[in-house]
Amino acid sequence: MRTFNFADLLEIVAETVPERIALVHGQSELSYSALNEQSKRVAAVLSSHGVGRGDQVGLQLINSPEYLTGFFGACRIGAVPFNVNYRYSPNELHHLYKTSRAKALIFNRQFSREIKDACARNYLPPVLLEVDGNELGLNLVDEITKVSVGHVEKLNDTDLIIIFTGGTTGYPKGVMWPHKHLFFSALGGGGFFHADGAISEPKELATRVSEGMLLVTMPLAPLMHGAALWTTLIALFAGHKVVLSDEANFDATHAWQLIREQQVNIVSIVGDAMALPLVEALEANQAGLEQDRWPLDGLFHIGSGGAIFSQTLQKRFTNVLPNLIVSSSLGATETGTLGAGELETEEGIMRYAPRGDLEVVVDGMRLAMKGEEGILARSGMVPVGYFGDEEKSRETFVTIGDVSYALGGDAARREEDGSVTVLGRGSMCINTGGEKVFPEEVESTMKAHAVVDDVLVVGVAHEKWGQQVAAVYCANVPEVDEQQLREFCRESLAGYKVPKVFFRVDTVQRNVVGKPDYAWAKSVAEDAPS
């Protein structure tokens, strides 16, 4: 009997369209049959080294077929795959290996030094599998040749996947998702490309795949980022082709070349940090500076999740490609994908029409009344907690009445008509003279100004107001009239939300997938000469 375990779902697709191309990476292609077979062999390797149900398997890999075969291979034996941010310091890696209780680690050779340094702090995953060498661990390719695919573990809907958060407010936390819950809450339940919506039984996936459109999807963020992994899995479980860049670091020019060569239809990004270089390269191409080397007839959608995709940049994309659909979706590792707000809003960053799975929770104990603010929450198929952290789990995953909720961290308000306005990241809220200011709203306004390329907004100490609003920004012109910036902001924002001080930098610092580094921005603002 088929389950919603992701290895089972991949096998359903592979049995339905075995010869269809599943994955393109550089010059290599994998059919669905080959992807499924290689995943089984990785599962056999893990099993041969004592890895089994419930054991944690880390994936410290750049975007590559091995990331996915490692992921599905772990799923196939009931083990628990988890993402490892390869930009972490040895100290952060040590913390991650130890707290995750990793039984196995699949990694690229280029990370051997960092892994050695981390393991020198007295925790070493027992099974080390190196995909492109044997400097530190066993060579995965060699190990695959030694095994045969034998007994298949009985799979369950409740087998777990752990997704570690970005760690922007301290060490990362591992969110434990049952496969079935993640399939429906983050991947749309197989319904993103079908008018009938989500499936109800795993076997229905075969019909969806055989009858569906043949689309090409390209995630530009690393697969270690939840949004990129979710985009990839959505495409694979729809029988689409997934294109992964063979460049270790994001490069807009290379991305457009791949989009053209592979006739990509759907591109997934993470916020303005990716959107800005992409649209600048696109505009240069459109202006003839690149001699129109990127005909993009097949591209119809660019979607962002995990960070702000500003309206200004969305408009720049559609100015060049008028038929392009651009979207910005809200979501979190703890809540899954919430989608784009359907309603216009004069405040905050997004507004949702009333729906059964979205609520505003106050103090983690009760649902908000109309007009009341709290934390945005999702009910239904939600995670079961943070791995190894019962205290944080109790704070984030709550039960009200007999309904389970996951709190995503965004402040929100229940409106009089039942709709929900998302105000911004609650942990970043600035309190100035008793008024709340959410950085994302101010950042979106500033980014609409033609000279501002990127900005982070933080609160800094103020003798009278407690905190004042500070903007750390970079610009595309030599000189900026900051008073003019204030006046521009005041056209859209209440006076207390307008930045009182500005700090210009060469580059606004973000992490590898474009998420803001607010600690850095705060240090810039606080350490600047007064």
Segments (PLM) and residue ranges:
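Flexible, low-complexity linker/hinge segments
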Residues: 1-4, 135-159
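Structural core segment of the AMP-binding/adenylate-forming
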Residues: 48-49, 76-144
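Conserved AMP-binding A3 loop
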Residues: 31-33, 160-197
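Conserved AMP-binding/adenylation subdomain of ANL enzymes
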Residues: 186-219, 224-268, 281, 285-288
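AMP-binding/adenylate-forming catalytic core of the ANL superfamily
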Residues: 88, 95, 105, 260, ...
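Gly/Ser/Thr-rich phosphate-binding loop
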Residues: 237-240, 265-269, 280-348, 357-359, ...
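Conserved AMP-binding/adenylate-forming
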Residues: 2, 28, 45-88, 436
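Conserved pre-ATP/AMP-binding loop-to-beta segment of ANL
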Residues: 147-166, 170-173, 207-216
